[in-house]
Amino acid sequence: MNGETLLAETIEMKDEIVENRRAIHRAPEVGAHLPQTVQFVEEKLRLLGYEPRELGGGVVAELTGEDTGRCILLRADMDALKVREKTDLPFRSENGSMHACGHDMHAAMLLGAARLLKAHQSELKGTVKLVFQPDEEGFTGAKAMLKAGVLEAPEPQAAMALHVNSGTPSGLVLCGKGTFMAGCTLFRITVKGVGCHGAMPETGVDPINIAAHIYLALQEITARELPAKTPAIVTMGKFSAGHAPNIIPQEAVIEGTIRTFDRDVTALILRRIGEIADATARAFRGSASVEELASAPPLKNDEALTEQMARCAEMLFGEKSVYRLREGGMGSEDFASYTYELPCAYLLLGAGTAQEDARYGKPMHNESVVFNENILPRGSALLAYGAMQWLEDRQ
């Protein structure tokens, strides 16, 4: 298949891909249950001639050309975040959630790839399995689909995924071989005290005070207990307690994340969080417990497959369209679970910088982040062309 021709076809489809993206963006859903998004994706796939089925909370569809036994999986996530959107986009969300991580872009790009692949079905040297996944953000989606049998009947021998990246020049493809993204573990610390009147704190045990000391003490783990060259981040993004200014509450809750490239380091940090929380709480006459909520392992890109997909991008968009990273980043992604089951390639696609447009370049997960829709055809083309080339080269 000629890459230049395929890219031209994709550019002609731009309006449709953008329309699909905006429809998904306008009605974001969070978590593992995405009924409206699933229905939308299934309807679009049926219109293209696919026979989609629901699996593990997501959607799966296959397309076979020549029956060779070869199969590659293309995956897009489609869940949103509990962020109230503050953009001025005419298709902005108004339901209190937001596609602030670009998963609407991913789903639309895979739908675009589905149309391209269908148009070239007779040229496929095997099967392409399309996977639309829920709850990447909560780290349960990939595991649920794997448990439900997404790697069965037919069994793929490779998998690929794309993720848009705000702050990177539009259309630039970033890739890295080996460990490309950190693993992430979500945790919750529950601090128990004794509620009382705010005027008489001596009659109770203040869980907010205890939790504040725990929060500060946990900063010492990465600063003083790990080697300086060991990448690790402990972030506590949620701290909740109480309902009134004059009442000392019964309980305080901290939720956070641990990010590392090494599962043993994660285990060490989680153990120390438990020890520090327990000791600190007891020092102030309270108690604390720590629980692991969910996790994703470090993402490991297969070197050969990743290089092949990078070369596909260069063939489509030019030699200067790809930047090969020498080391991974501290972001996390539950596509990582696939990377321990079969060879995988996970690439980033630049979605705009502030130098291009003042609206672009804001942080991922920000309430005002805006992604450049002009990159959508590139994403669709790379997914489709990468799959076709992999099937062709496996002969």
Place the predicted regions along the sequence by residue.
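Metal-dependent amide/peptide-bond hydrolase catalytic core
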Residues: 212-395
